[in-house]
Amino acid sequence: MQLLTIGINHHTAPVALRERVAFPLEQIKPALVTFKNVFLGPQAPNAPEAAILSTCNRTELYCATDDRAARDAAIRWLSDYHRIPVDELAPHVYALPQSEAVRHAFRVASGLDSMVLGETQILGQMKDAVRTASEAGALGTYLNQLFQRTFAVAKEVRGTTEIGAQSVSMAAAAVRLAQRIFEKVSDQRVLFIGAGEMIELCATHFAAQGPRELVVANRTAERGQRLAERFNGRAMPLSDLPARMQEFDIIVSCTASTLPIIGLGAVERAVKARRHRPIFMVDLAVPRDIEPEVSKLKDVFLYTVDDLGAIVREGNASRQAAVAQAEAIIETRVQNFMQWLDTRSVVPVIRHMHTQADALRRLEVEKAQKMLARGDDPAAVLEALSQALTNKLIHGPTSALNRVNGADRDSLIELMRGFYQHAPRSNDQSGH
């Protein structure tokens, strides 16, 4: 079985492409079924394994397969599933086999590959991805072991390095940008659209600035109300957004919608109603919640996750010593995992050897039983049984020795000597 990771992320693709390749949560289980049955094939010698990790910053397919053409087939599957031409998608895709796939998984879970260096949210997202794959019946020995090791490595990295210390989060970056637009965030009305973890983080940071008003709009009213109450804010129905958008100076959106929920026309009307007072908008969703054309409006300052990346990277530069320490830990753990993987590669061979040897044993025992049944001398039967088993068991090695030449033969001879140098001694020879 070969490990392979196929994906795109914030390093390789802009948000405009990432949002087209993202998997909504409800699509992941059925996607895994097609990925296994159509791409990897139901007739594979070993059952294929797969998991899909889809976040704002990355979409990745982790798989274990016997298919030697897995790389190209995976890219084609991803292209077909999302109806994106291969020529458009392929330049942004990375394909990581074996140890590279292992190293990547360890780095992602440890926060080393995140836009926010050392952030912890990705670890929870990865655990959710593994849970979903398990529920879909898509995991097996190889990926289960990979992800168990991955989570252990992430815990070790975060527990022994300062990789997460003083990190500049996306939420903190959003506040910093708002402070560039408005002299005082405390004078502004802030609207949060959504009620997930990212919005909760943003609300925490903005609430610390003491805004004039804090409002949460969410599709599920009860969840939005709970979040608003935590920050002494108010909740409003998401359906009220078009009519009330002009009330807010700062709008932060991060929902799971597959289509934009804020269109150009609605923002144009809001700007006009505000008499061209500026609106600061942050779209942290992938796919995006706000139509990108909104950024062209004169009095609107629209930022996406990619735009916030520059501010985040400023904070990342100061923690390179922790990065080096984390990378060293990861490299050691990658080598450990590859040793385990190497031992797994011989398991099918050992299993086959046992099966073949047992088939020979049963065949010769059956012959011996027939000989005994017709009254043959038991000692002669045992001798015939042992001779037949000996001849059959050494037939494969002797045939191999006769077939090979040169250096290969010398190596095989040394190998065989090692196998048979500790031949058991008979009872008579041992003196018992």
UniProtKB/Swiss-Prot annotation:
Keywords: NADP, Oxidoreductase, Porphyrin biosynthesis. CDD domains: NAD_bind_Glutamyl_tRNA_reduct. Signal peptide: none annotated. One of its GO terms (molecular function) is NADP binding. The keyword Acetylation does not apply. It catalyses: (S)-4-amino-5-oxopentanoate + tRNA(Glu) + NADP(+) = L-glutamyl-tRNA(Glu) + NADPH + H(+). NADP(+) binds at G194, A195, G196, E197, M198, I199. Substrate binds at T55, C56, N57, R58, S114, E119, T120, Q121, Q125. Catalyzes the NADPH-dependent reduction of glutamyl-tRNA(Glu) to glutamate 1-semialdehyde (GSA). Belongs to the glutamyl-tRNA reductase family. Homodimer. This is Glutamyl-tRNA reductase. It comes from Burkholderia multivorans (strain ATCC 17616 / 249).
